[in-house]
Amino acid sequence: SGGMIADALKFFGADISYYARSEKEAATAKGYCFLPLEKLLAESEVICCCLNKNTVLLHEEEFRQMGNRKILFNTGLSPAWDEAAFAEWLEGDNLCFCDTIGALGSEQLLNHPHVRCMQVSTGRTRQAFDRLSAKVLANLSEYNG
């Protein structure tokens, strides 16, 4: 999802920087700037976490590097952060957006004034439902021979 988000934001004129385990040729070809995590966190106004489930990237030090007056989006299935460090960061002038409690990490944070959580998976589109249904039917047909 990170690549699609970057492409959409670029369309609207955003300067795109990213962090990954390694620099991506396709991203470089689009003019996206690969940065070390600490530099990306310090320089970006908006940060989108698009990580695999149970991948925690943001701890106390990373939130310190982010500083204040930031917007954090999480499109993952689980939190991209250590909960205690995240809760402390939320007390600053920051905002967090996510789609589900699973992505937020704690039901206790739902009513936090700096959290916006829809509690509905943004990946649950009609097209995704149709694709999943077709996949299940194909698997059943293959299993039954």
What are these regions (language model features)?
Residues 8, 17, 61-71, 142-143:
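P-loop/Walker A phosphate-binding loop and immediately adjacent motor/lid segment at beta-alpha junctions
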Residues 23-107:
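Rossmann-like adenosine-cofactor binding region
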Residues 11-29:
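NAD(P)-binding Rossmann-fold cofactor-contacting core
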Residues 1-13:
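Glycine-rich adenosine-cofactor-binding loop
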Residues 16, 34, 72, 114-117:
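Conserved beta-strand scaffold positions in the cores of enzyme catalytic domains, especially
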Residues 97, 102-145:
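C-terminal helix-to-coil terminal segments
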